Amino acid sequence: MHWEEVAGCRMPRCVAGHPALDFCNTWAGWGEPADPRREWLPDYDHFAVWAMHAGLVTGDACERLRRRAGRSRGAATEVLGQARELRSALYAVLLDGAGGADRSAFATVAAHAERAAGAARLVPAPPVESPGIGGPADAPTARWELSDRSGLALPLLAVARSAAALLTASDRPRIDACPGHDCGWLFLNPRGRRRWCTMSSCGNRAKVQAHARRRRADRTD
């Protein structure tokens, strides 16, 4: 099963190895005709829960976002539309590269990433316990954080930051897309050995189909 119940919402499992890729995987059937049944983010409520599920916002922030969205449905719908726009553009850039993708796709991702960078603030890093004085040499002193004051845009800004981090990583592993029917999910594939999003869904389905084809071929021989 490639989904699970989270805070009352059906969520796709995070199997990609990076939140930005899991965000792209909130749509299934890339390259296929549009079908609302392939959408994992049918409303803002699901978007907020997904951001929590992916580790991009806290549980408390998620609850605040859901309550606020209930009071400001128009604004919530607008943010959801922007998130879907970013998702489509990010998928194109990740799959084809910045040079191969439509320039408008990269421009869309860049605009969202720049907005997220402008909304971040530098805050002290959580303390790290260490027997030594001053803590480990590689322990960060501070970190970038998005404020809850970002309002309903918080999960959108968080995923844009995650996307920017992935796109600018010098040691980024190879990214592949699942060839399964009605899938196209992305995942990190550092060794190049992974083929499917998960063996329990697309992998097993392909095995069953291949077995059926072999049986039909045997009957015709």
Language model feature labels by segment:
Residues M1-A177, T220-D221:
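Short helix-coil boundary/hinge micro-motifs
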Residues L154-H211, R216-D221:
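BZIP DNA-binding basic region
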